[in-house]
């Protein structure tokens, strides 16, 4: 339970997550905006909420602001840093490739164990910033 000032019977514990923390996938990058979007929901189907983090300004494959999302499964009530997963458009699960200013990970939703990821800056059919969403069936 959260107890920020140390008042009461339960002491507080705060864990700071970023891409400079050992075990977290990816590398820290100026301006990547890790944590722009955060969602706690059970996507690993173990009955415990996991943490999804959007980093829409992350460089992917040399494309600035392409974006990623990170999944931190929870183990014993804490985010697992050694089993986190990083998702981006250059992975084979996604059609296409990373685009500059695609902003993948600006929004995240779930439908059961599936992930729905917003990419509002995605160019589509030659139209700039037309936007797209990705449905990742897990």
Regions inferred by a protein language model and the residue ranges of each:
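Conserved beta-strand/short-helix segments
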Residues: 1-138
């Amino acid at each position: 339970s959260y107890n920020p000032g140390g008042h009461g019977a339960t002491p507080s514990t705060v864990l700071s997550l970023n891409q400079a923390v050992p075990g977290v996938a990816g590398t820290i990058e100026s301006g990547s905006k890790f944590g722009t979007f955060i969602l706690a929901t059970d996507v690993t189907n173990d009955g415990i909420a996991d943490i999804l983090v959007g980093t829409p300004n992350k460089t992917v494959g040399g494309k600035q602001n392409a974006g990623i999302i990170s999944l931190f499964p929870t183990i014993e009530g804490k985010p697992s840093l050694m089993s986190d997963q990083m998702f981006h458009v250059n992975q084979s699960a996604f059609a296409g490739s990373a685009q500059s200013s695609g902003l993948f990970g600006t929004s995240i939703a779930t439908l059961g164990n599936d992930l729905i990821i917003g990419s509002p800056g995605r160019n589509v059919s030659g139209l700039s910033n037309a936007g797209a969403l990705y449905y990742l069936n897990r």
